Amino acid sequence: MKKILLFTTILLAFLSMGFAKSAGKKSVAVFVPGIIDDSPTYNMLVQGVKAAVEEKNQSLAKKNKIDLFIMEAGTNQAEWGPKITALCAERKYDVIISSNPSLPDLVEPILKTFPNQKFILLDATKEGNQNIHTVCYNQYEQSYLTGFIGGLMSKSHKLALIAAQEYPVMNNIIYPYFEKGAKAANSSSTVDFRIVGNWYDATKGAEIADAVAKKGVDVILPICGGASQGVITSAVNNKIYITWFDDNGFAKAPGTIISSSVMEQKKMSYNVTKEFLEGKTPWATAKMVGIKEGFVDFVQDDPNYIKTVPEDIRKKMANLLADIRAGKVEIK
């Protein structure tokens, strides 16, 4: 009996040592809902996480260095759920970090099967789930600024927003505040809201852009991933304007793109990864960052912006941006 107890004690001690070793070693996965090379947003996501992990690993012993895995899921949204499920099923990632407004609704059902999995989701909003922390960029500001310059530049006073799909941030913030900004610039402005149905179909994006152009729309905001390239092609062919979201897009079509509102995705992905590795992630919370915090900006110094947009309109944009940054104007 004593031998059995001794063996059991040794076995438990051995197992606990193994578990302690596993507990001391963290593993991070980055889920890219798209293609890294095709998306500055996802490239910044990956670079920020990498930087935080590499920085932390410099202070860790080899056996405790953090493992980093990057899954490039592609643009077919129907495959995102199964691929996230596969990551969760491996049960080895302490956190899965990603970025897309549609992801909270996608991961919540998956968490019913994998209740211990943690997610940090950027460019998204979700409160109240202990397994999820989200950070969104102030898209009230982004959308309003984009709509404001669109309203100033439009000669027909007809604008369009072409989205990949409908989701809460799109329906409740981006679309209404894009319209609000356009009407603030010119009360006669109208916004035609169209849906592609996915994040990759450039042909359909072009078809929708052609259709709204025929109705007199002369400024389009595309938020549809890879389908945005089709919208740009159509805009160039129809000699109308594009307002751009999330990164500096002026080089994509000089003379056609009139604005770029940018978000500091690399800096934010670095911050949330570092926060997680330090055990400081505020789970179940949703954070918003904007112009005052230095995570949202409106590009004013690009040569193509200066060349394409008249000086009087650039001055109006500069004044509005300065007022927001100083707290004189709050967009909400």
Regions found by a protein language model. Give the residues of each.
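A residue-level marker of the well-folded mature domains of exported/periplasmic proteins
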Residues: 21-332
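Short, low-complexity disordered leader/linker segments with a strong preference
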Residues: 1-27
